[in-house]
């Protein structure tokens, strides 16, 4: 029975891995955007983390996840004689597939090893596989998803080293050193998860000190070695012209830059400040749902310590949550590594009520976060070259025999930032697409930008030079007054929006306005009018 359940959950995980929801801009801009632009020369815009004077993001742990698959695809297309590099949609789904495979193999394997009792392992693996976090966050290209795997395998190796008392565990210590370096360079939050469980290694190292402390030498030596490689990789990435002496004399150590940046509360204020209880009272319940409620209820028996608290997984997750709660910027994805750890401590209740609530919770959040959350941004950006080519006006400066150039400006409004790399390559330069991200500016500001850019149309029926497009959620009621309706003969404004393309599976949660509109009207607008559309902006009377 458990095998059939696990296989069904595996199919569900594949479905969500290939669904184009968009959970946070970091999943594109701190990974695929960087390497797609570097390897394939796709249009890209590096985020500030990579362009600051003291960059805070390392490419060392990202290289095997993004650079290697993209480079292999580039090589494969070149070997098969393809005239162009791999299209962005292929890159997009291959990277999603890589994240799925990493989670399927490494996360499930680690969970299976971390549970000490064989009779609980199958149920625990199924429980973790049934979490919407596994379906969605863990299959997206987040550094947090990679951190989950590194934390889990860090705990696995610590357990192997501690349990194996008769051997020096040189190889396990070397691998643990690599995981520690990769984890720190991936996210500076990584040590919070392994700091306390790692104390179990001290007696092991001390016990081996009777003879030469081979395990300790292995861990420290390989740690220094991998640290040096990581620093050299980052220095070469950010300063390509630097010599080896330059890298040794003035290295770029991104974790230190990251720590210094996040230690300044004024920097964190730019990203949003939260109360210190946000992780425990909001984020963990959002990630774990009824399982977290059952864990909280079990604490009422104190001072008797619940069984699920008496293991390194729970200590790792809860101690990390306490440490991360010190910092005032708190997002749910920071706690993604806690999900498999805490669920592996939880004994599945045989109550039908709990199982029903668990399934409803994960199904609802799975569809919301895995399909609808900003779900139209990626399909719209992938379709944008085709939309523009089919609808734009050719520029007037093309000479006879030349490929005419189509220029367009695309305004994105009330969406997450569109990944530029999804526009792909354009070797014939027939398309010139300028993307302007207006984020959530007031509606009148959008119209003002359109009025500035749209050329005058003095003669009715004349064609306007260039093209202007607007991408926005269909729930943005402000645009209704400008939307062109063929059934209406009257022109309500001097500016018209002609809908060219739409994608139904898109919900913009940032557009919720319960305070002004009320709960029901807001939900009716945001959910009832779900979808993302592409409009072409024109002045009234222009063709």
Curated annotation (Swiss-Prot):
InterPro entries: GPI_mannosylTrfase (IPR005599). Its main location: endoplasmic reticulum. Pathway: Glycolipid biosynthesis; glycosylphosphatidylinositol-anchor biosynthesis. One of its GO terms (biological process) is GPI anchor biosynthetic process. One of its GO terms (cellular component) is endoplasmic reticulum membrane. GO terms for molecular function: alpha-1,2-mannosyltransferase activity. The chain crosses the membrane at residues 5-25, 98-118, 176-196, 213-233, 353-373. This is GPI mannosyltransferase 4. It comes from Aspergillus oryzae (strain ATCC 42149 / RIB 40) (Yellow koji mold).
């Amino acid at each position: 029975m458990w095998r059939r359940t696990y296989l069904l959950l595996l199919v569900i995980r594949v479905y969500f891995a290939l669904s184009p929801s968009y959970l946070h801009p970091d999943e594109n801009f701190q990974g695929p955007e960087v390497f797609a632009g570097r390897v394939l020369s796709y249009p890209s815009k590096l985020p500030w983390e990579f362009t600051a004077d003291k960059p805070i993001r390392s490419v060392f742990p990202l290289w095997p996840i993004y650079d290697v698959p993209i480079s292999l695809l580039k090589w494969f297309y070149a070997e098969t004689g393809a005239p162009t590099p791999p299209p962005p949609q292929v890159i997009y789904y291959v990277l999603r597939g890589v994240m799925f495979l990493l989670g399927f193999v490494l996360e499930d394997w680690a969970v299976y090893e971390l549970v000490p009792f064989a009779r609980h392992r199958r149920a625990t693996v199924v429980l973790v596989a049934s979490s919407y976090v596994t379906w969605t966050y863990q299959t997206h290209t987040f550094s947090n998803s990679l951190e989950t795997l590194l934390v889990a395998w860090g705990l696995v190796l610590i357990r192997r080293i501690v349990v194996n008392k008769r051997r020096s565990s040189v190889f396990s210590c070397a691998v643990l050193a690599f995981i520690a370096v990769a984890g720190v360079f991936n996210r500076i939050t990584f040590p919070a998860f392994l700091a306390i469980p790692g104390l179990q290694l001290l007696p092991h190292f001390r016990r081996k000190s009777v003879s030469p402390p081979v395990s300790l030498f292995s861990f420290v030596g390989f740690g220094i070695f991998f640290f040096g490689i990581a620093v050299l990789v980052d220095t070469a990435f950010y300063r390509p012209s630097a010599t080896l002496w330059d890298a040794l004399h003035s290295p770029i150590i991104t974790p230190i830059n990251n720590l210094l940046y996040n230690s300044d509360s004024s920097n964190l204020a730019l990203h949003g400040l939260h109360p210190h209880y946000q992780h425990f009272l909001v984020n963990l319940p959002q990630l774990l749902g009824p399982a977290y409620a059952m864990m909280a209820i079990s604490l009422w028996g104190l001072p008797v310590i619940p069984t699920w608290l008496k293991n390194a997984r729970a200590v790792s997750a809860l101690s990390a949550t306490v440490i991360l709660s010190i910092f005032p910027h708190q997002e749910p994805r920071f706690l993604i590594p806690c999900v498999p750890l805490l669920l592996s401590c939880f004994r599945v209740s045989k109550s039908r009520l709990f199982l029903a609530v668990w399934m409803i919770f994960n199904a609802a959040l799975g569809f919301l976060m895995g399909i609808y959350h900003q779900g139209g941004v990626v399909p719209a950006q992938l379709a944008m070259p085709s939309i523009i080519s089919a609808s734009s006006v050719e520029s007037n400066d093309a000479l006879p025999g030349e490929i005419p150039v189509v220029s367009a400006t695309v305004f994105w409004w009330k969406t997450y930032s569109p990944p530029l790399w999804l526009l792909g390559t354009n070797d014939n330069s027939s398309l010139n697409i300028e993307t302007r991200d207006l984020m959530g500016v007031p509606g009148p500001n959008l119209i003002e930008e359109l009025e500035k850019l749209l050329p005058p149309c003095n003669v009715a029926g004349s064609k306007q030079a260039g093209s202007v497009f607007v991408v926005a959620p269909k729930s943005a009621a402000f645009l209704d007054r400008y939307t062109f309706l063929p059934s209406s003969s009257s022109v309500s404004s001097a500016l018209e929006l002609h809908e060219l393309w739409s994608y139904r599976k898109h919900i913009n949660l940032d557009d919720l306005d319960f305070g002004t509109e009320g709960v029901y009207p807001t939900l009716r607008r945001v959910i009832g009018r779900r979808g993302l559309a592409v409009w072409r902006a024109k002045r009234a009377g222009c063709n």
